[in-house]
Swiss-Prot record:
Residues 457-469 have a biased composition (Basic and acidic residues). GTP 2 binds at residues 182-189, 229-233, 294-297. It comes from the Bacteria. Belongs to the TRAFAC class TrmE-Era-EngA-EngB-Septin-like GTPase superfamily. EngA (Der) GTPase family. This is GTPase Der. Associates with the 50S ribosomal subunit. Residues 3-167, 176-349 form the EngA-type G domain. Residues 435-485 are annotated as: Disordered. GTPase that plays an essential role in the late steps of ribosome biogenesis.
Amino acid sequence: MKPTIALIGRPNVGKSTLFNRLTRTKDALVHDLPGLTRDRHYGHGKVGSKPYFVIDTGGFEPVVDSGILHEMAKQTLQAVDEADAVVFLVDGRTGLTPQDKIIADRLRQSPRPVYLAVNKGEGGDRAVLAAEFYELALGEPHVISGAHGDGVYYLIEEILENFPEPEAEEADAKHPVFAVIGRPNVGKSTLVNAILGEKRVIAFDMAGTTRDSIHIDFEREGKPFTIIDTAGVRRRGKVDEAVEKFSVIKAMQAVEAANVAVLVLDAQQDIADQDATIAGFALEAGRALVVAVNKWDGISEERREQVKRDISRKLYFLDFAKFHFISALKERGIDGLFESIQAAYNAAMIKMPTPKITRVLQTAVGRQQPPRAGLVRPKMRYAHQGGMNPPVIVVHGNSLHAISDSYTRYLTQTFRKAFNLQGTPLRIQYNVSENPYENAEDKPKKKPLRRVSLSNRIEKREGRKEEKNRFKKKTKVSVKKQFSK
C-alpha cells in the first residue's frame, strides 16, 4: 500500500505550493488569499522507487466554531485520520503564532507521526528560522521552501524511510472516471456525498464552495471508480475573483480527464443558457453524459411539467443522454443514476467488430439509400471503428462528401440502436476514395513512347536502304566489259 501524507497548517503557509512540488503538478489552486484551498485534494507522488499519496487540506482554523472555516477544520481532522503521516507546515517568515500552537496541541493527540516543516525558508539561516519552533515539541523542524524545492526531497525521504518498500504491482487498470459538472450551488457536492455515503466534499450554502476539482477514489461492488467534483461554472461576467477564474479552467480540465460527465441541473431554477453551454462543452469534448435534475422533491407537479418542457426545448441536442430526476439531499434516485453512469461508460468504451459494423451499414443503406447530389449518388462500401470515448465509426466509399447531415443523423441513430450506445456521443467520419488525378493539372504528362520508337525504326530502315544502294553502286560490273577482255 502507498503511504498517505497529509499537509496540515493554518491558511496561506504554502500547503498548495508544497502539494504541487510533491506531485509535480499544478492541481491545487495557488493564490495569496487565505483559505483558498477549501477542501481536501488528493495527488500522487514518487521519490525514487517509493510512491505515495498526498492530501492537500484547507487552512486549519481550529478556533472557529461555525461557518465554512469550521467545516474546513473538520475536513482537516478527517484528513489526519486518513493519513499515514502528517506534515505540519508553519511560516518561517511570519514566525510562530498562537494558532500554530493550537494546531500543534491537536496534532500531538493524533497517533500519526507528525513532521514539522518550516516553509518559506529560502535565503535564510536555517538554524535561526528553526529555533523558535522547537517550542511546539514536535521534533526536529525541517526548514524547506515549497516554492523553490529546498529541503523538500530530504523531508519526504525521511518520511518514507519508515514505510516498507512497496510490492511490485500490476499496471493500474482503467476504470470509470466521472466529472460532476454544473452551475454553482445546484447540489454537485451533495450528490457526490450521497454516492459515497460520507461528507467528503464540503457542501455549504455558498455558491462556489468547491473551488478546486476534487478527485475521489472509491469502490462500488468491488470495482474501482473515481468521481471528480468540479468547481461551479459561473457565467463569464460573474467570475469576478481571479480564484474563480482559475476554478472554471479546472472544471473544464476535469471534463477532459473524465470518461463520463454528470451534468447537475437545479429543478427549482429555470434551465439557463449556461446549462446548455456547459452541456455543449462536454459534448464537444466527446464525453458520455448523464443528466441529474436535482431538488426534484421540492417542486410542484406543475413545475415539474414546466421543467421537462424546458429540457426538451433547450437541451434538445442531448437526445442520447439519460435524464434522472433526483434528490441528492434525501438520496433519492441515486441507484438509478449510478446505473446510467455505468451504462454510459460502457457505451463510451465499447469495442465494435468491423464485420458487424459493415453489416449494420449495409442494412441501413439497403433500407434507405443516401439521396443523390445532382448526378452523383454516394456509395458506401464498408465501415470500421476509429476510436473510443467517444466511439468513432469510419465509413469508406465514393462521393461521400455529398452525404447530407440528415442522412448522417439517420446512420447515427441506426448504429446507436444496433450497439445500444446510450449515454455517449457517436461520431461518424467519412473516408472518401478519390481519384488522385481528378484535376487536370495533377495528371502526368504522356510520353510519346510509340512515336519515338517508330521514328527510330524508320530511320534505321532508311539507313539500311541507303547502305544497300551504296554497296550496289560500288560492286556493279558490266557484262560486256568482262567478255571483251
